[in-house]
Each structure stands twice: as C-alpha cells, then as structure tokens.
Amino acid sequence: MAIHAGFAAEIENITEDVLTLQRDGVVGKKGVFSREFIGRLREDMMTAFWEAIQRPGGAVSRGPRRWYVELHPQAVSGFMDLVTHPWITGMAEAVLGSEYQIVEVGFDTPFQGAKNQPWHRDFPSPKDTYEDHRITSLAFNLTGVDVTPDMGPFEVAPGTQWDDGRSWKHEMFPDPAAWSRYAGLAVRKFPAMGDVSCRSALTIHRGTTHDSPIARPVLVIGVDAPAAGHAALHDMMVTKDYHAALPQSVRERLVCRVVDQLVPITQKHDIEGLVMGVA
C-alpha cells in the first residue's frame, strides 16, 4: 500500500478526527499517500479528462473553465489503495456505520480562467442531518497537485453542514444576501500531494478564481450510509473479472454495475446552479 512513511502510527485513533468532522464538517490528514502515488493518480485523472471532454455527458460543467468527470474504478490505478486505506475506511465506518457504501469516484478540475463559484452544497440536506445532526454521506478528496494561492483554492465554511437549506434555490444554494456570513466563516484550503480530506458535501463551500496555468484536479470518493440514496446519481461499472478479484470488504460496499465490457459514463449529477459561476 502506498502509505506515506511514518503515517501508520497515526491511524490507530480517529476519534479526534471524527469530532472535528462533526464540528466543522471537514477534516484533513497530511501526508497519507506518497507523492509518487499521487503523481500516477494525477495522470489517470488528466487522461480521463481529455477523453471525457470530447463526448457529450462525459465532462459536466461546474462553472467557466471548471469540469467534473466521473470515473470507473478500473480507470484509477490506485483505487484499491484508496478504498482500503485505514484512515478512509476508519472515518467512513465511524461516521456512516459498518455497512457504508462506495457510490462515486470522480474528479473536479478547474483550469486557468475558472471563476468563483456561488456558495453551495452538493445536494439537499436530508432530515437526518438538518434535524438530528447526523452525517449520512462523506466525500474524500485528494489533490493531484500542491495547491498554491493562484490555483483557485477550495473555500469551506466550517459548521454549516447543519444549516437547514430547505428554503434555498434547489435546496443547495443560499440566497446571495447570506453570502457574507459564509465569507466570514470561510477557510481556504491549501492541501499538498498526498493529503486527504474528509468532508460532508453539505458543508457550504465554493471553488475560487483560478489564475494559474496549471490545472488543479481533485479526486472525489463519495461514500454513503445505507439508504442515503446518492448511488442513484451515479453509474459506476466494473468488469466481471475485476469485480471477482476485489476483496470482499470492497466488493460488498461498491455500488456498481458488473458488466462484460466498460462503456463511457454519461453523468447524471448536473448541478445547474454552478454552470455560470460568479465574478
């Protein structure tokens, strides 16, 4: 496994990370994977991007010069290292329960010229979250590059995963009159290659203006509690031989179609409110 040297001792107790996630809606871990591993992951993402952008439904706009691409697990050379990593599995099980599901693999890629996104969450909040303060899904993120200030860093407003949101546009986009609150709470994230973050996709966030000529691909692994329902937004596939070779712990959690031959993914999760971006 491509675990950064010296990291193993840090994954024994994740209680503090779970508490941080519950409080802030996001938590990060430094140096989880080697830079060499992330370099291969970046190549996988960019290869997939240039293939996807050439076909309808392959790359979905998340604003000007910003796209989201979903992947089949087999397109990610380090997929098994990712979904069996003890910190990732430990966080998923601690927050979502032992029967958590892997429902999404994809990546977001802003290029030079990408604009600020509106403040948003990735889907409407369920009653379990806005009433009972229970997180029912997680997104694990890994950057493909060392993020610098000109690369449109991710901004997140800690603690906003509990905001109700039922009165918002699409239940995902706060009224612009409330944006100053999120800007006041916002923290800019500057992860390096090898770092992993774990967040609730309900925590209010946005991508920011990207001036660098270097693209900033970020892998997303989406994980659900049973019955959270986000698998319906995605269409992962694996071949029969790949599925049979998976360890049982992954096979029983991976929500996907098992097929004779992979076909390109036509994406289902188009977030209309992000297409135009903001200045």
Task: List PLM regions with ranges.
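Generic beta-strand structural signal
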Residues: 98-105, 115-117, 134-142, 152, ...
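Active-site glycine-rich loop that binds ribose-phosphate moieties when present
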Residues: 121-128, 142, 174-182
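Aromatic-acidic/polar surface patches that form glycan- and anion
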Residues: 34, 77-84, 133, 183, ...
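Non-heme Fe(II)/2-oxoglutarate
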Residues: 2-6, 11, 203-279
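Double-stranded beta-helix
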Residues: 147-208
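Short edge-strand/loop segments of extracellular domains
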Residues: 111, 157-164, 222-228
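Non-heme Fe(II)-dependent double-stranded beta-helix
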Residues: 2-24, 29-130, 234
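Short, conserved beta-strand element in jelly-roll/cupin
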Residues: 129-149, 190-193, 198, 221-225
